[in-house]
């Protein structure tokens, strides 16, 4: 076939497909290159040979089996590659898989798309189960346009980090096998970030694969906004520094004995500590000196942010509460990687899988639990300690298990919700409990009156979480309706509504200066909101699954977020950059808490462990270390396994005592 005929066939094909302007441009181009000679267009309707050629090409182009064959060959090649490069090469499989499926659905090959999806979904369920469950509902071309998740995938690109040799191996395969379909999908939906050096390991997947596109552009624009993450002016910590800092050892002993009167378990631990040998005391003194040195080094290397003014009218703190907080701060134990705490763990028994959430007051004296039967139960640990351990646990599984030795319940029962309770949290002084429920309401309870005071209505769907601000009075809530809201205790309408997440907002946390709140969502992002304007000022992208827990560092600069897969990510609020992921849990991370000075992070998980992390070293990585890939995830300093008890809640007290709570469950066989 001579070039003239080929050009005629191409023009005929373009006209058949409706690309008349392209056909016209090709005719004019050919006319110019042939020195003005006329270009004779072929009527492909009257040319059997041309019609046959066009039809065969069109059939091959629309053949749904090409997707399955192309993906299967690419998959086999990647799995059979050398172990050194296999993991990097496998990173392209998930983006190619989802776009092959959506292309098949978009072309109307529904049955072939379902067969393709079911054949290869097991390869990706471990990491992308929730995404696959959403894609499973895409069954027609109209679904691709209607479903926001599918639209975002079609418009976005995936950034994948490849070493130079892995990238060359992939290109060589695509060209040698003439895999034009796979090449087109990869070219359209994947951006490769090629670096020199050795391939990265499987533990680097979180940073190596990120979604870019219109959403990423929006996030980059938002993350350029300036935020004031410093602490408030004239804070209690500043007053403490001005008045002389820590108390003497004798004053510390008085503070510890007073704190022990409020909590029997703390009293017993203090007595045991007093019975320790002088050698142990010497070791503790050395550890304290080492910790002090570490703290001094940190103050030299990390300059604090300028103090800021509150954007909300904060409540006036009573003198008694202020003095109590200052006393706790003076007696606070300095923690570090060489001076780690133990855990005081509260275990719920006989819950019959009904415990949804739990919370601990700032000093550990009160413990609350929210249950599926719409009830809230509050235990006063000081009273229980005085009554003896018999009040804590029943000997049998009867209906009288809540009755203590004196004929009274060992807890206070709060009834008012009409659906499962998903969060219950104490106010900073411990005089109120805030609860949220599937009945779409938030309720405020008094721990002194043991009664419901206010019912807040505004959300349209179940409310997953509600948290008091660090100074009380204000609180934030988040819901299945994809919004977060800010409330004050004296008003039944929300003060602000934060909208922007693409899915459920699962958790909420206040910034220490009360000018911002952070929200974690099932859309795998964390957002930071300005409470005064209601605007989103930061979007943190990097999680692979729904975000279930959040914690702010005491200095307000860093944030930790935990997800359903067990990954914890450390974020710098000023730059919206992930400092380092913390890998170690193998199930949902339900609770996070920073120590008082911010040197340690505690995490509680459904894998029945509490882990301690040294977060100070993770925040001191240089740019050169990050560029060279030396920002390896920190291993936990210490792991505390529980007795088949998933950790629902944990928190550091103001004196740096670590409390945790969970419901015992039957161990898996």
UniProtKB/Swiss-Prot annotation:
Disulfide bonds: none annotated. Keywords: Activator, Nucleus, Repeat, Transcription, Transcription regulation, WD repeat. One of its GO terms (cellular component) is nucleus. Residues 244-285 are annotated as: Disordered. Gene3D superfamilies: TFIID subunit TAF5, NTD2 domain, YVTN repeat-like/Quinoprotein amine dehydrogenase. WD repeats lie at residues 350-389, 416-455, 458-497, 500-541, 543-581, 584-623. It is found in: Nucleus. CDD domains: TAF5_NTD2, WD40. InterPro entries: G-protein_beta_WD-40_rep, TFIID_NTD2, TFIID_NTD2_sf, WD40/YVTN_repeat-like_dom_sf, WD40_repeat_CS, WD40_repeat_dom_sf, WD40_rpt. The keyword Lipid metabolism does not apply. Expressed in roots, leaves and inflorescences. Its main location: nucleus. Pfam families: TFIID_NTD2 (PF04494), WD40 (PF00400). Component of the TFIID complexe. TFIID is composed of TATA binding protein (TBP) and a number of TBP-associated factors (TAFs) whose MWs range from 14-217 kDa. May homodimerize to form the scaffold for the complex. Interacts with TAF4, TAF4B, TAF6B, TAF8, TAF9, TAF12B, TAF14 and TAF15B. Belongs to the TAF5 family. TAFs are components of the transcription factor IID (TFIID) complex that is essential for mediating regulation of RNA polymerase transcription. This is Transcription initiation factor TFIID subunit 5.
């Amino acid at each position: 076939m001579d070039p003239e005929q080929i050009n005629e066939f191409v023009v005929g094909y373009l006209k058949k497909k409706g690309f008349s302007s392209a056909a016209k441009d090709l005719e004019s181009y050919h006319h110019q290159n042939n020195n003005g000679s006329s270009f004779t267009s072929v009527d492909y309707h009257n040319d059997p040979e041309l019609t046959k050629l066009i039809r065969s090409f069109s059939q091959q182009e629309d053949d749904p089996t090409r997707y399955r064959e192309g993906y299967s060959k690419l998959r086999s090649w990647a799995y059979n590659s050398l172990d050194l490069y296999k993991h990097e090469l496998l990173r392209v499989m998930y983006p190619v898989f989802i776009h092959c499926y959506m292309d098949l659905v978009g072309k109307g090959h529904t049955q072939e798309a379902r067969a393709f999806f079911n054949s290869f979904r097991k390869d990706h369920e471990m990491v992308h189960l929730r995404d696959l469950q959403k894609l499973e509902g895409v069954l027609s071309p109209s679904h691709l346009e209607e479903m926001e998740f599918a639209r975002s995938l079609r418009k976005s690109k995936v950034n994948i980090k490849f070493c130079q040799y892995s990238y060359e191996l992939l290109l060589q395969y695509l060209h040698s096998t003439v895999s034009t379909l796979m090449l087109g999908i990869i070219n359209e939906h994947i951006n490769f970030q090629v670096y020199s050096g050795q391939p990265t390991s499987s533990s680097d997947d979180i940073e190596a694969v990120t979604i870019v596109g219109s959403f990423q552009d929006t996030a980059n624009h938002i993350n350029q906004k300036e935020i004031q993450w410093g602490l408030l002016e004239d804070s209690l910590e500043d007053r403490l520094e001005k008045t002389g800092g820590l108390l003497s050892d004798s004053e510390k002993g008085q503070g510890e004995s007073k704190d022990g009167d409020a909590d029997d378990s703390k009293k017993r631990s203090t007595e045991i500590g007093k019975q320790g040998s002088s050698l142990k005391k010497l070791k503790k003194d050395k550890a304290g000196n080492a910790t002090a040195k570490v703290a001094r080094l940190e103050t030299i290397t990390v300059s604090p942010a300028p103090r800021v003014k509150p954007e909300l009218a904060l409540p006036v703190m009573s003198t008694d509460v202020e003095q109590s907080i200052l006393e706790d701060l003076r007696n606070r134990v300095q923690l570090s990687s060489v001076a780690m705490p133990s855990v005081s763990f509260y275990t719920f028994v006989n819950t019959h899988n009904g415990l949804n959430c739990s919370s601990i007051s700032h000093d550990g004296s009160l413990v609350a639990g929210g249950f599926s039967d719409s009830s809230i139960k509050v235990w006063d640990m000081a009273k229980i300690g005085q009554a003896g351990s018999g009040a804590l646990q029943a000997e049998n599984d009867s209906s009288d298990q809540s009755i203590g030795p004196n004929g009274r319940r060992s807890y206070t029962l709060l009834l008012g919700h009409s659906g499962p309770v998903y969060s219950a949290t104490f106010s900073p002084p411990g005089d109120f409990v805030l609860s949220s429920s599937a009945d779409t309401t938030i309720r405020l309870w008094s721990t002194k009156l043991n009664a419901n005071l206010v019912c807040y209505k505004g959300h349209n769907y179940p409310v997953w979480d509600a948290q008091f601000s660090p100074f009380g009075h204000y609180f934030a809530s988040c819901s299945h309706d994809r919004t977060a809201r800010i409330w004050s205790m004296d008003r039944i309408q929300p003060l602000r509504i934060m909208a922007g997440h693409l899915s459920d907002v699962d958790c909420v946390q206040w910034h220490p200066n009360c000018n911002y709140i952070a929200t974690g969502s099932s859309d795998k992002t964390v957002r930071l909101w300005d409470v005064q304007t209601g605007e989103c000022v930061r979007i943190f992208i990097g999680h692979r699954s729904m975000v279930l827990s959040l914690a702010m560092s005491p200095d307000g600069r860093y944030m930790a977020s935990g997800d359903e897969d067990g990954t914890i990510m450390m974020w710098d609020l000023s730059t919206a950059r992930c400092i380092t992921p913390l890998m170690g849990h193998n199930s949902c991370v339900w609770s996070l808490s920073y120590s008082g000075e911010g040197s340690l992070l505690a995490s509680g998980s459904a894998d029945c462990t509490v882990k301690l992390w040294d977060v100070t070293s993770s925040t001191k990585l240089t740019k050169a270390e990050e560029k060279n890939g030396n920002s390896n995830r920190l291993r936990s300093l210490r792991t505390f396994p529980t007795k088949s008890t998933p950790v629902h809640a944990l928190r550091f007290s103001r004196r740096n005592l670590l409390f945790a709570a969970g419901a015992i469950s039957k161990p898996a066989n």
